Amino acid sequence: MHNLTLFLPCPAGVEDFLLAEVQAICPAAAASAQRQRGGVELTGTWDDVLRLNLHSRLAQRVLVRLALQPCPHEDALYQAAHQVLWELWFTPAQTFKVELTAHQCPFQSLNFAALRIKDAVCDRMRERFGQRPSVDTVQPQVRLHAHLGPDQVWLYIDTSGEPLFKRGWRSDTGDAPLKETLAAAMIAASGWTGLDAQGQPQPLYDPCCGSGTVAIEAAQRALQIA
C-alpha cells in the first residue's frame, strides 16, 4: 500500500505524549514516527490515517503532506503550491480553505502568503478543468494546510475535516470550555490509565471539574471508546 507522510499537529508540550499514542495506535509505523515542533510526523498508510483519525485523543488533525519545497520568497511559494497535483485530491465543485502557520518565516504578511497559495490552487484547477473552486472560510469541504519555515514550505491536505477535539458528545459549550484534546493531554501527563499497578480500577478525581471534560475524557479512555 502506498506510503504517505503524515503530520499530526498538537499543542506545544504535548508532542512526547502524542508520539507515544501514535506508536501505540500504529505499531507498524512506530519506527518512522518522530517528534517535531508542534506535532508528530510519521510514514504511514491510508489504514493508519483512518486509525489515527478514529483513535487519537491528542492530535488536533491528521494531515497528509503533499509537498516540501524551498520557499525563499512569495513567488516561490506560488510555484510550490502550483506544482501540487491538487486535481487528484478534490475538484472545482468542492469548496476549500487555506490555513497557514509559520515559524521564523521572513514574509511580511502571512495573509498575503495564504492568498498566494489560494491563487496557485485556483489557477491550477482552472488550467486542468476550465473552472476554479470557491473558497469557503466557514465550512469548507476541503482544508489545505501550509507551514512556512525560514526558507521552506510544507503543504498538506487535511483528512480530518472538523478538528479532532470535537468528539461529538458536547451539545453546549458553556463558559470557557476545556478542549477535549487538552483534557486528554492533562490525563496523559498525570500518568492515569484507569488501572493501578495490580490491574485494579483506579479512580480519577477532578475537584474543579467545570463542565466535566476531564472526567468524560477519562471515562472514554478507560472504556476504550473511540
Name the predicted role of every residue range.
Residues 2, 149-151, 212:
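Short flexible coil/turn linkers enriched for glycine and charged/polar residues
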Residues 2-142, 200:
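Non-catalytic nucleic-acid substrate-recognition regions in nucleic-acid-modifying enzymes
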Residues 45, 101, 149, 156-162:
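Generic beta-structure capping elements
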Residues 48, 104, 152, 161, ...:
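Short loop/turn segments at secondary-structure transitions that flank enzyme active sites
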Residues 143, 152-154, 201-204:
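Beta-sheet entry/capping signal
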Residues 155-193:
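SAM-dependent Rossmann-like transferase core, predominantly class I methyltransferases
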Residues 178-226:
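Conserved S-adenosyl-L-methionine
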